[in-house]
Amino acid sequence: MVKIGVLGLQGAVREHVKSVEASGAEAVVVKRIEQLEEIDGLILPGGESTTMRRLIDKYAFMEPLRTFAKSGKPMFGTCAGMILLAKTLIGYEEAHIGAMDITVERNAFGRQKDSFEAALSIEGVGEDFVGVFIRAPYVVEVADNVEVLSKHGNRMVAVRQDQFLAASFHPELTDDHRVTAYFVEMVKEAKMKKVV
């Protein structure tokens, strides 16, 4: 069974754990740097990206997260997690982890009161996935090596680049675990490649 970590500094941690377990993988809440070595993949949950960055800096997680990103192990960023993975953020000089060749705009769908749900078609996942958008970012631009998995209107809301997956919405806030299951499969495939 693959072990999937959920960065446990802030955000919808418990919901991600439930979704990982429902997808047939073992979930580990990552609160210490050394736990990164024990896991096969990592979820960066939604939350408030500036608060999350402050906590990442406080607990000296940034370099270990960048090292993890270079290790070939899959990472999945949802909402604020997408912001952490992006190489370019509109209105900001520097990226956070900066692992994905995407440009992201923060709070692009508006403030908290503008939160909404939308039925999405997601490549590799299926139709009618209910995306929960809460002060969500979206992808403005992608490099050629990034696959766009889903759009809401003309806005890119789910993307994949090699072992990295990012979504504007919160897949863990519904009982539909297909997006998490898709990531679990990515982790299994990456682990199999390492064995071979």
From Swiss-Prot:
Pfam families: SNO. The keyword Lyase applies. The active site is at C79 (nucleophile), H170 (charge relay system), E172 (charge relay system). CDD domains: GATase1_PB. GO terms for cellular component: cytosol; glutaminase complex. Belongs to the glutaminase PdxT/SNO family. This is Pyridoxal 5'-phosphate synthase subunit PdxT. The lineage of its organism: Bacteria, Bacillati, Bacillota, Bacilli, Bacillales.
